[in-house]
């Protein structure tokens, strides 16, 4: 099937992938008066007296805004907010189908950080959570931090944290097969944007011994010239041996390669310089940093990609719906590091030890256990962290 042509045809047929359905049925005078005026005044007054009632008397408790400025849409780059709408609608479909979360797409026409933050903050009272999507780095870091400081609902940039959670789940299981502990492993992440930095942070929280991030220039280390603020910050807590040079030099002697970068940047020769039984997660789409057959021929024990036509797909859809489901269920005020870690372990747990193999380290996207398992783990972590409000 030519997915591009067929998708374009179907989008024209669908004329939008989501729609609004009424939960309150209005079919006579009484039902009209209850759903709208005059009856609707009573819940309005109740919320006026206590804004927290908005979670009980409206759909806010289950509503998430999926918000972009269109500056980093898929691999298409800065294509503008309107052009990002098909992706935002698609994300909303995934929220509903995989997490039973009602999500609404919002494409904001500004590249100014403060203007974007103010816009999102001003509408946040309508939602139980905010999912930031396809916002360019390093602006995405500043936007998320400012919104987290202003809002009393979860702010979650899925390109960062959803990816980090799934990669962490993959490595929790991969290390079972390699017989190595994360605390003994060194990883190299090629790509130091939103996903790469978030992956590094979460893996270090999980106990990874060390990680080297690389960009187009090569290894990132403290004191390297011309680093943006986000790279400067991550350089202070990574690459403890101050490795310098190219990607190939950084990868030598490592146990794990994680690619969130560009096609074909990793070669068989470079993989051969890694430690025994290396793990290669080559997630560039649609063409990975190295093809799975090439990586395995070079000695990789486990290979994952971002594609569904190869084993071990690293797909955020196994993470973000359940994470938000759990956060919404306990009316969490934020999504903490412990909630992300709980999600990673929950996802990993869905691959039974007797079924775990080099070609099966993550549950499949359509595994019906994912939503409830991840949601419960996240909700329990929220309670332990004191951010649950029910």
Across the structure, where does each feature detected by a protein language model lie?
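General beta-strand structural signal in soluble alpha/beta enzymes
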Residues: 105, 131-134, 155-158, 189, ...
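Short, ordered loop/turn segments at secondary-structure junctions
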Residues: 69-71, 79, 108-109, 134-137, ...
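Solvent-exposed alpha-helices and their adjacent loops that cap or buttress functional pockets
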Residues: 12, 55-60, 96-97, 122-124, ...
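Glycine-rich phosphate/diphosphate-binding loop of Rossmann-like nucleotide-binding domains
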Residues: 74, 79-99, 151, 157, ...
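Adenosine-phosphate binding glycine-rich loop
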Residues: 158-159, 282-390
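Rossmann-like adenosine-cofactor binding region
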Residues: 232-302, 307-309
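N-terminal ligand-binding/catalytic initiation module
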Residues: 1-155, 375, 381, 385-389
């Amino acid at each position: 099937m030519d997915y591009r042509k067929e998708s374009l045809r179907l989008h024209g047929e669908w004329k939008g992938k989501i729609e609004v359905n009424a939960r309150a049925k209005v079919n006579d005078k009484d039902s009209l008066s209850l759903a709208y005026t005059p009856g609707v005044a009573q819940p309005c007054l109740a919320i006026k007296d206590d804004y927290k009632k908005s979670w009980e008397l409206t759909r806010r408790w289950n509503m998430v805004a999926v918000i972009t400025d269109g500056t980093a849409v898929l691999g298409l780059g800065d294509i503008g907010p309107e052009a990002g709408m098909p992706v935002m609608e698609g994300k909303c479909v995934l929220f509903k189908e995989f997490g039973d979360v009602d999500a609404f797409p919002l494409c904001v026409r500004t590249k100014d950080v403060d203007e974007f933050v103010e816009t999102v903050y001003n509408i946040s009272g309508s939602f139980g959570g905010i999912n930031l999507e396809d916002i360019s780095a390093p602006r995405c870091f500043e936007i998320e931090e400012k919104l987290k400081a202003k809002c009393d609902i979860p702010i979650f940039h899925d390109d960062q944290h959803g990816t980090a959670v799934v990669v962490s789940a993959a490595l929790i299981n991969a290390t079972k097969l390699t017989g190595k502990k994360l605390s003994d492993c060194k990883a190299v992440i090629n790509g130091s944007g939103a996903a790469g930095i978030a992956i590094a942070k979460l893996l270090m929280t999980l106990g990874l011994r060390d990680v080297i991030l690389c960009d187009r220039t090569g290894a990132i280390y403290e004191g390297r010239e011309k680093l943006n603020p986000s790279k400067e910050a991550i350089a202070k807590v990574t690459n403890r041996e101050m490795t310098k040079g190219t990607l190939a030099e950084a990868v030598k002697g490592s146990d794990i390669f994680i690619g969130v970068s560009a096609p074909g940047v990793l070669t068989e020769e470079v993989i051969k310089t890694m430690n025994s039984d290396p793990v290669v997660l080559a997630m560039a789409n649609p063409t990975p940093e190295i093809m799975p057959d090439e990586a395995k021929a070079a000695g990789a024990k486990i290979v994952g990609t971002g594609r569904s036509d190869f084993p071990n797909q690293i797909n955020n859809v196994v993470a973000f719906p359940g994470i938000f489901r759990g956060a919404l269920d306990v009316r969490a005020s934020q999504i903490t590091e412990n909630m992300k870690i709980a999600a990673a372990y929950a996802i990993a747990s869905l691959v039974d030890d007797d079924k775990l193999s080099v070609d099966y380290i993550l549950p499949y996207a359509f595994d019906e256990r994912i939503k409830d398992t991840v949601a419960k783990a996240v909700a329990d972590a929220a309670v332990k962290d004191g951010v649950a409000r029910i």
